[in-house]
């Protein structure tokens, strides 16, 4: 499936080349030779150079197809493993031949056997095999940086790191020795110097854990944004309950408290309580009812203020977490912006122009320019949506404070009604 997708990408990469040739403006014809002027306008990749001879054109396209073959080879680890085993067998044949020479056996048959085995290995020299492995490893690094899931089947438990480079992560789950690159799919490449510098001396490739930490930071930012939204929803639910309580008290209170109940928050509930207490006429019971109403009003006012303060603090906390989550989302958005297939097309074309992926890896500025394209717009979009979310959470907290104050004053209204019944 990976080969089919990359074949499609390779065919797409040819369109910008032909389109750039078609965009060249035709020039004037002078003395039997045509001259063309103008350059390609598209930004899909570098335009094909003008070839002076068929040999030069053949050399360019041969390099182009070689680069594409290297990309496929980076995703086909079985071939690499077979070549490695064959190279190991070639080394063993020389040892067997020398041992049989010491024992006085037939040298001619040993040489023919050794030659046959070397032919079965493909006849590749050590230089060709190492060049192929270097090219495949370079493409593996590029594909991982672009976000493709490249799993090295040979490294199930991970490789040890050197003094400056972290170990190469395997396909095992998080927590085991091979999970140095964040389980292979989420974290960065463990063999990069930036990820593993100073930590790669251990045998389990500890340097790659920097890549895993990057994935953890992304998950943390998501959890923070969810927490802010949850705080806002909780405050809104409290507001609904408070409003319902105040309305019920208004229906049970006397006519004098109706005006107070139409207000919002703690003031409405305290007015209902004092109205219920003072509406009764009697001897000692009237004074008792008024005192109970005043006491309930003061308790309700204090409770409302305390709840309002708590809600304000919660709103501020939600806004803070929302803004920090927005900053994290903006950073991750700018890093992950752009289409990985588009970038892969540009990298394949650039590697063809430079004569191979090894030359491209030696020029990190060109590679970084392609990697960082189209990232700023994605980051800005993420930051805008996060900011809107934190504002909504703050508004919900304020509404919750007003409603909760009304609910707390329900006890005051009940005390006034009891005093009236006592008369």
Swiss-Prot record:
Any one annotated GO CC term: extracellular region
Q: Which UniProt keywords apply?
A: Secreted, Signal
Q: Tell me which tissues or organs this protein is expressed in.
A: Nacreous layer of shell (at protein level).
Give the Low complexity compositional bias ranges: 31-42, 173-183, 248-284
Q: Where is this region: Disordered?
A: 28-47, 78-133, 159-219, 236-288
Comp. bias regions, Basic and acidic residues: 81-93, 102-111
List compositional bias (Gly residues) regions by residue number: 159-172, 205-219, 236-247
Q: Where in the cell is it found?
A: Secreted
**Span of the signal peptide:** 1-20
Name of the protein in question: Glycine-rich protein 1
Which organism was this protein described from? Pinctada maxima
